């Protein structure tokens, strides 16, 4: 298949044809979560966005090594160089070991990702497991003159780097702007410049997580982990680095600076960023206190939710917008997504009820849908356009089911194949099990109603109807027992 995939490169600010450095191999690194709390809708978006990319690249025949890290050390409060480590703080408040906090929330993150049908990455490295690599990175930057030691900590010299290179090329900022918007915080006097960022921090006596280094017992700066682990697993140069748009500055800007300062050039060819989930126009996030975690969505337990929403409803809701567009949360939007997904799912089920005719009449464009979906995917993963084409296909199916059109066996198989490929394999949607409480309650009411009709038939000595209801239910797996008070039943699974 000819490669026509274009992706928006944040670095060049334009769509570019995707050309892997070492085809058919593709290296992709995505910033994963800092595991000090439950994953929320904002965490679901990058996971789903880059899951789509992973799935599509794999479908196109590439051998993708997908690395998504786990931040379990070094991420300080407010994404700054001072303050308490987010995980260490949670551990202190909960009276747990930091790695207990990490493991608990990592297990819950994995469970949520599995529910959302997000494929696991090829490698999921932990920052705490790569301290040696991060120390080696800091040593290289020091050796090349772009960092300095101060009171046991090591800082990146942004001004020195900017003289030789361009600090701010990813975010479009210049150093003067950065300096004017960087606050001088207490305890930052050891920095030469407020814009300098920590590569290694000397740990205070109360800091739980610490490792020996040439400079002090301490811990790596937040930005080091991705540069070090990206290099370890994908090499000095790799294809794609992704993450949320909120990471462009400072995190990814600092990653580029670290890469250039340590090895002389940028490691990454394409930088990709998904936009934010918002609530009333404000970014959803733990630090804003306005987030709804995924478990609350799945069970409808948050005060802002009017009902529970299934994992596939959440996935479909996110895919209805292009990954570079903002998505504003509302119950109305989620309910519309729920209904839309149900329409598509019912249409796919309807395919199995269609008897093919000798030719297709009354509908046009069956064979064009596949190419249209490919065109949309190749246009920077334009999932909302793919979904629009799937709805076109659903309308064709419903027209045939309503006996207003006919479809040939060849076109019927094409629709089945096209829906399976784009809806399930590439967009990663799936049919959800119908054994939830709402469905079970509905089934129970129907069975009770039938058995009440059977009781009336027995009372009227209509044995034929009574036996027919019992036998039909038995054929469906329902075991019915008559009692002196009426009846009991159970479903034999």
Curated annotation (Swiss-Prot):
Subcellular location: Cytoplasm
Co-factor binding comment: Binds 1 zinc ion per subunit.
GO molecular function: ATP binding; cysteine-tRNA ligase activity; zinc ion binding
Biological process, per Gene Ontology: cysteinyl-tRNA aminoacylation
Any GO CC annotation of this UniProt entry: cytosol
Main location: cytoplasm
The protein's required cofactors: Zn(2+)
E.C. no: 6.1.1.16
Chain residues that bind Zn(2+): 31, 226, 251, 255
UniProt motif ('KMSKS' region) ranges: 283-287
Binding positions (ATP): 286
Catalytic activity: tRNA(Cys) + L-cysteine + ATP = L-cysteinyl-tRNA(Cys) + AMP + diphosphate
Description of how the protein assembles with itself and partners: Monomer.
UniProt-listed PANTHER family: CYSTEINE--TRNA LIGASE, CYTOPLASMIC (PTHR10890:SF3), CYSTEINYL-TRNA SYNTHETASE (PTHR10890)
Family designation: Belongs to the class-I aminoacyl-tRNA synthetase family.
HAMAP family, A to Z: Cys_tRNA_synth (MF_00041)
Protein name per UniProt: Cysteine--tRNA ligase
Annotated source species: Phocaeicola vulgatus (strain ATCC 8482 / DSM 1447 / JCM 5826 / CCUG 4940 / NBRC 14291 / NCTC 11154) (Bacteroides vulgatus)
Lineage: Bacteria, Pseudomonadati, Bacteroidota, Bacteroidia, Bacteroidales
Gene that this sequence comes from: cysS
